[in-house]
Amino acid sequence: MSLSGRERPAWPGSRLSWLLCCSALLSPAAGYVIVSSVSWAVTNEVDEELDSASTEEALPALLEDSSSIWQQSFPASAHKEDTHLRPRGSARARPAPAARGMFSYRRESGSSEASPGPRVHAGTARSLAHASSWGCLATVSTHEKIQGLPFGSCLAISDGPVHNSTGIPFFYMTAKDPAVADLVKNPTASLVLPESEGEFCRKNIVDPEDPRCARLTLTGRMVTVPPGEVEFAKQAMFSRHPGMRKWPRQYEWFFMKMWVEHIWLQKWYGGVSDIPREEYFKAAPRKA
C-alpha cells in the first residue's frame, strides 16, 4: 500500500523541541510588564512592598519638599536596610526647628547648687552700693516732647561715710535739674550702679560693661532728706565728694535720698537676682 495519500503522523520530539525554543525566547521577558511605552523590572517582593508602602509613604513624601518636580520614594524596609550603604551627604538635611525665644534670658533659680545664696547676693549688693560714688538715675520724664518716657541722669551718690554704710543712696540736688522736675510729679525712680570702681574690674582691667562686672539696680521713691538727717547727709556726700562744698550756692542745693523698695543684682553671665529688702539691709559690705 502506498502512504502518499495518507496524513503523516506528528512526531512528539519535534513538538517538544518547538515548545522549548519558544519558552527560551520568552523567558527573559517574564519579569517585565508594559506600562505605556516604558518598561522596568518588577519582582514580586518589590510589588508587595510598593503596595504596602503606598498609603504609608505617599503623604510624608508630599509634605517633605515641594520645590522639586521629581520626588523619589522608597519603601519603609528599603530605608531601614540601606541606611548603612548610603553616604552621609546623600540624605537630605532637614531644617532644625526654630528656637521659641531668641532673646529670652534664663532666670536664676534658687534650687541650683552652684548659685550663691541670698546672703551672698545681699552682701555683694551692699558692697556695690557702698563702693559706688556715682550712678544713673532713671525718672519718668515730664518734658512735653518725651512726656511719660524714661529719662536718665548720671549723678554723684553716697550711701554714707567710708566707715558707716547705710545702703541708702544720698544725692545733692538742685531744683534746676530736669530730674528734680520729674520727681516732683512722680517720685518713683530707678538707680543703676555699675561695678566700674570694684576690685575685680580694676585688677583684671575689665570694661564696666563686661558681664563679669556686677550691676545693681535699686528701685524706690525719691524723698527730700528731713532736717534731722541733713547733717548725716552732708558727711555722707562731702566726705566722698569734697568738691561739692564749693559748688555755686545760687543753685539752691538740697539733699535727697532714695527709699529703697526693690533690689536687683545682675552678676556674671547669669540672670537677675531679686534680693529681699530685709536681706539687703541686714547684710554688711565687704571691707576693701
Swiss-Prot record:
InterPro entries: CREG, CREG_beta-barrel, Split_barrel_FMN-bd. Pfam families: CREG_beta-barrel. Residues 78-100 are annotated as: Disordered. It is found in: Secreted. Glycans are attached at residue 164. GO terms for cellular component: endoplasmic reticulum; extracellular region; Golgi apparatus. Brain specific. Residues 1-31 form the signal peptide. Keywords: Glycoprotein, Secreted, Signal. Belongs to the CREG family. This is Protein CREG2. Its main location: secreted. Changing residue 186 to Q: N-glycosylated.
